[in-house]
């Protein structure tokens, strides 16, 4: 028996498809999402509707974004969900979530079992729309969830941690074994809740500057910041900000990265592109 086939659909490697089939896990995720009628619920990657069906049962309308043409067609003819669904057959990386929120007249509640091969770039895409999003619940590779929630002074702490925590409160929900999927992935999975901050705890003047600093620092994470960020900050400047130049990227808090970004915005702003 081909373990890549589930409900008559062959899981496609190029789309990173692993289909959730464990009823206990599905019920736990739906309980965590807690969908309510009247909310602008949006599912990314509904696949074979493991989450779509129990969430859709509670709603009058549900928006789904599915790249796979065959799966989108199956959803259109779903026996009891079809009439409730608005289906976008496209890559979620190309979706303008700000426009979708304006169309639906309220902030979005986004959820999904995300393809692991695009989960990190998709996170960054969604972060740019957090003013249009109420919350997000995602199944991800456990290692990615560990990176999202990691704090300074840990190996998992990186650029994704800083940017996620800049935009959102990040809350791990539950861990999921490979046996909950068809085909079983080679890694453990986990569900995470991301809630955009109502008020930014560490507002930055130019998000591009924060992005640049974190990229340069973590691309050379074994170097001290006097070296990795030496082209942006002098030792004296770092010391004046109360930041030890001998620290490495993983030792610097989100608040300190934001402090550095604001200093640079005020003293060496990026040119408009």
UniProtKB/Swiss-Prot annotation:
It comes from the Bacteria. InterPro entries: KsgA/Erm, rRNA_Ade_diMease-like_C, rRNA_Ade_Mease_Trfase_CS, rRNA_Ade_methylase_Trfase_N, rRNA_adenine_dimethylase, SAM-dependent_MTases_sf. Pfam families: RrnaAD (PF00398). The gene is rsmA. S-adenosyl-L-methionine binds at residues 18, 20, 45, 66, 91, 113. Signal peptide: none annotated. Specifically dimethylates two adjacent adenosines (A1518 and A1519) in the loop of a conserved hairpin near the 3'-end of 16S rRNA in the 30S particle. May play a critical role in biogenesis of 30S subunits. It comes from Salmonella choleraesuis (strain SC-B67). GO terms for cellular component: cytosol. This is Ribosomal RNA small subunit methyltransferase A. Belongs to the class I-like SAM-binding methyltransferase superfamily. rRNA adenine N(6)-methyltransferase family. RsmA subfamily. SMART domains: rADc. Keywords: Cytoplasm, Methyltransferase, RNA-binding, rRNA processing, S-adenosyl-L-methionine, Transferase.
